[in-house]
Amino acid sequence: MRIPDFQQRLADIGAKPRHIGRMTRAWLKGLPLDVGRRQQQAEDFLPLSVREGLPALSLEIDALARLRSEHPAADGSARLLVELGDGQMVESVLLPRDGLCVSSQVGCAVGCVFCMTGKSGLLRQLGSAEIVAQVALARRFRPVKKVVFMGMGEPAHNLDNVLEAIDLLGTEGGIGHKNLVFSTVGDLRVFERLPQQRVKPALALSLHSTDGALRQALLPRAPQIAPEELVELGETYARATGFPIQYQWTLLKGINDNQEEMDGILRLLKGKYAVMNLIPYNSLEDDAYQRPEGERIVQIVRYLHSRGVLTKVRNSAGQDIDGGCGQLRARAEHVLGRRRPR
């Protein structure tokens, strides 16, 4: 379901624009659609036809994203296994400091070699209402003031739905534009569409290597764009929005943690409106990769930072419950597998 479909369903049961706006905001807050102001009953502000039609519609909206299981982590994050209306599963991650990582696809087609989500390929797209429903669901547990599109899927491959969700969250959803973070491997459509949007999110770009051939090997089905061109496109967007680009770099021991790569980062990012997020590799099943030792990570940060590239180590939230970067995949493969024989 897309957001306009949800709003049309409200109109179909007699809701006027003012009612639709009010009920949309209630939904975004994780509240019942007919919630009123303090000591105000639904009959005080909703037409009879809407009140009669809401129970069935509310069931349909609730089914967009149902919590199947919750897995709290020691760092205050929590991985949420979310069941969609058709029984497919995605994962959201509640982050410390009121953040939420949402999924935009069931599976992923990019197939990054260090990421679990793409192991099963792309199963289907999420509608914009299904994306927003993850936020509404999370807000039943805790406040959500930041939404990052870094869960399952490549947001650029579901661009219309993701941009619809971002627009609603950044207008009616009470989330600042800089706190909406669109993550991509570098699809050129992103750089065409995002500057045209009413809500322009912050942008995170998956870099991972300054060597074009190595980057293509790590992200085998990502657009074949040179790292230099990716950074220039990012810089143009950063200057237009006033938000620095967050460059993502999964640190892989013996692969992209060498001195040549560090000097390549300086060459590309020094003087740019950018933040380098170093993400030590998170362990997966049947690992072929490792993260560098802690001492080496500290050396890299000091080297880059002292030479003019703002560098942060992003120790992914929820690693102990497989909620960290690269670890997300639908545990529903097992759940659905158990269902099928019935």
Curated annotation (Swiss-Prot):
SUPFAM superfamilies recorded: Radical SAM enzymes (SSF102114)
Disulfide bond residue pairs: 101-325
EC number: 2.1.1.-
Keywords annotated in UniProt: 4Fe-4S, Cytoplasm, Disulfide bond, Iron, Iron-sulfur, Metal-binding, Methyltransferase, S-adenosyl-L-methionine, Transferase
Record: residues binding [4Fe-4S] cluster: 108, 112, 115
Co-factor note (free text): Binds 1 [4Fe-4S] cluster. The cluster is coordinated with 3 cysteines and an exchangeable S-adenosyl-L-methionine.
Boundaries of every Radical SAM core domain copy: 94-320
Main EC class the enzyme belongs to: transferase
InterPro entries: Aldolase_TIM (IPR013785), Methyltransferase_A (IPR040072), rRNA_lsu_MTrfase_RlmN/Cfr (IPR004383), rSAM (IPR007197)
Active site per the UniProt annotation: 91, 325
Key word 4Fe-4S present: yes
Cellular localization per UniProt: Cytoplasm
Positions annotated to bind S-adenosyl-L-methionine: 153-154, 183, 206-208, 282
Top-level division of the source organism's lineage: Bacteria
Necessary cofactors: [4Fe-4S] cluster
GO biological process terms held by the UniProt record: rRNA base methylation; tRNA methylation
A single MF term (Gene Ontology): 4 iron, 4 sulfur cluster binding
GO cellular component terms attached to this protein's record: cytoplasm
UniProt similarity note: Belongs to the radical SAM superfamily. RlmN family.
Name of the molecule in the record: Probable RNA methyltransferase PST_2231
